[in-house]
A protein has these predicted regions:
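Short histidine-centered catalytic/ligand-binding loop motif
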Residues: 15-18, 72-75, 130-138
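A broadly used, surface-exposed interaction patch
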Residues: 66-97, 104-106
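Well-ordered, non-membrane alpha-helical segments in soluble/globular domains
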Residues: 19-28, 74-87, 142-146
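Helical scaffold of the NTase/Pol beta-like nucleotidyltransferase catalytic core
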Residues: 2-44
């Protein structure tokens, strides 16, 4: 499965963890620069459903590569990322590029924050695959849901792409990018898009999927467990910073 965490902390000595209450202001700064392109950066992960009082190290966003390619008159997403970075630089923002992302430093409340903008095909559709409905206090994050979807897709003879949707395992052709249909394909005929919101909601609709969780939990070297450990460590570090 595609690695969803490309940037890490780009400016460790310059940006700060931030209260999710300011995400709206951060997004306004980003999208004010993008207005002329006709493309809009959309929040994903926890940024799509911010919780005031909860802190984040960065804001992840997705933007449609096709719209940028058309606006900048370049041949591919790589060229679009180059132009996108220059656009933000011209607007006075500090930037960096890594992988598929352009990183932008916003400034709200006198402090700097990191925004990671992933430039991907069909960005508006892809962003829906990264919006989660995690229960309060859940030990699982969005990445765990993505891993679970990938395992469910494999069991059904498909592949899961966090940017395209459900694809044919043999031909890589798109099977569906509609979450309602994907839920029915992976869970059952009575499933809905809402059942794909979290690990817990998948298990509630499909108890047999507990086998996937058990298998992942049993492997100490799995991405599933490594992400849980990393998340716990980050929460401890963030708590210490606030003391």
């Amino acid at each position: 499965m595609t690695n969803l965490n490309e940037g890490g902390n780009i400016w460790p000595d310059e940006t700060e963890d931030f209260d999710q209450a300011i995400i709206g202001d951060m997004m306004k700064q980003v999208n004010s620069v993008l207005v002329k392109t006709g493309a809009k950066a959309l929040p994903i992960g926890s940024g799509a459903t911010p919780t005031p009082g909860k802190r984040s190290g960065d804001l992840d966003m997705i933007i449609d590569a096709g719209k940028l390619i058309n606006f900048f008159k370049v041949k591919d997403a790589k060229g679009a990322r180059v132009e996108l970075e220059q656009l933000f630089q011209q607007a006075g923002f500090d930037t960096k590029k890594t992988g598929t992302s352009v990183h932008v430093k916003t400034k709200v409340g006198g402090e700097a924050q990191q925004v990671d903008i992933m430039v991907v095909d069909n960005g508006e559709t892809a962003s829906k695959f990264h919006v989660h409905d995690l229960p309060k206090g859940s030990p699982y994050k969005g990445i765990h849901k993505q891993i679970m979807l990938a395992d469910l897709a494999k069991e059904k003879g498909f592949k899961w792409s966090p940017y395209k949707g459900l694809v044919n395992r043999d031909t890589n052709e798109l099977v569906s990018n509609d979450l309602e249909n994907i839920a029915k394909q992976l869970i059952g005929p009575n499933a809905t898009a809402g059942d794909l919101g979290s690990v817990e909601s998948i298990l509630a609709k499909m108890p047999s999927a507990k086998e996937i969780v058990d298998r992942q939990e049993a492997d100490p070297n799995s991405a599933w467990n490594k992400k849980k450990i990393q998340t716990q460590e980050n929460e401890i570090v963030n708590a210490l910073r606030r003391i």
